[in-house]
Amino acid sequence: LQMISDAMPQRRGMYLAFNKAIASEAQTKFHGNVDCRTFHSLAFRSVPRGVTDKLRLPRLSPSFIAKEYRLEPITLRRMMGGRYEKYVLMPSRLASLVANAVSHFCSTSSQYPAPRHLQAPSWLHPDDIDSLQKHLYPAIERRWLESIDPNHQAGIGHDIYLKLWALSEPNIPSDYVLFDEAQDADPLMLGILLKQRNTQVIYVG
């Protein structure tokens, strides 16, 4: 990667790493024409402050979400000993599924949350998985919209502002991008890079 940047001293480069420590170490090895960053640092600078300020707020617990969203116990069928039996998913468990669905959506290249982003337990009956996804979808959509609402006073994770940045289809400010450890990238990161129109992207790994 250093040789690539050395061969193009007149062009602005961007080295993208998965964490700040790797980016900081890389910055000491590249010349000044290469900026070393993480996806999150690029996103943090671009997303409205009202959203990133929510990183400092306390996160909503599953029990709070269950009560706030008025989630009720659901009786479904699960596989036990080679046959299906009735099983009750309690509100706090449903709330965790909702929160996890938003997190899963944030790691994808999808434009908007969908029922399929809810990852139901594999031991549920297939028909019940489908009905559970559809049943909880309004809660998933609400949780996402509240997460990106600067006026909603609840904490968020770093995945929220990264996803919001990705949805804006950002242009990375460089002539070329060096993406290290590309084999570990999720669909969100790859989606951002694939949409770069005027920037050469070099994948490594």
Task: Please tell me what each predicted stretch does.
Residues 1-54:
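P-loop NTPase Walker
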Residues 39-47, 117-128, 161-164, 190-192:
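Short alpha-helical interface patches
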Residues 52-143:
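ATP-hydrolysis module of ASCE/P-loop NTPase motor domains
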Residues 10-12, 59-60, 173, 198:
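A structure-centric signal for secondary-structure junctions around beta-strands
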Residues 13, 32, 66-67, 151:
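Short, flexible active-site loop motifs that bind/organize anionic cofactors or intermediates
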Residues 20, 37-44, 92-100, 130, ...:
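Non-catalytic, well-ordered alpha-helical scaffold segments
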Residues 132-205:
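Conserved helicase NTPase motor core
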Residues 4-9, 23-31, 66, 161, ...:
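Alpha-helix C-terminal capping segments
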